A protein has these predicted regions:
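A compositional/biophysical signature of low hydrophobicity enriched in polar/charged and small residues
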Residues: 1-129
Length: 129
């Protein structure tokens, strides 16, 4: 990757809906070489896809909460069981295994604190920590 590729990536990460000719103009290339660079980055996996960013407030999930999970069960069966429980909660959008004092970290999105309380009670009812 050279400076043109990095510039193209930076532009596309800010707004991937721009035309190739607009991107080319911004980086100082003609359209065809810019298009070839984008195609090469897609083919090599540097560019995995193009996404639309949503507004959490408009989707009624304006509160993001990070939930720390500690457990004394460190076996594959427990992890599989907990992962199945977590999949039943659309509020959990990310799930990480950690190191140190924290075993797992959940990223949860809900409309407000009241909704988080409801989520939390449902989670502790279903999971065994």
């Amino acid at each position: 990757m050279d400076k043109f590729d990095r510039q193209i990536l930076e532009i596309l990460q800010k707004d991937c809906t721009q035309s190739v000719s607009d991107v080319a103009q911004q980086v100082g290339l003609s359209t065809t070489p810019c298009w070839r660079r984008i195609q090469a980055m897609e083919k090599s996996g540097v560019i995995k896809g193009r996404v639309a960013l949503s507004d959490p407030e408009k989707l009624n999930v304006g509160l993001t909460v990070f939930v720390i999970i500690r457990t004394n069960q460190h076996n594959p069966e427990w992890l599989e069981s907990f992962a199945e429980v977590a999949q039943d909660f659309p509020e959990i959008i990310e799930f990480y295994r950690m190191s140190g004092d924290v075993d797992y970290l959940l990223k949860v999105v809900v409309p407000d604190m009241k909704a988080y309380d409801v989520f939390y009670k449902k989670l502790i009812n279903r999971a065994s920590f």
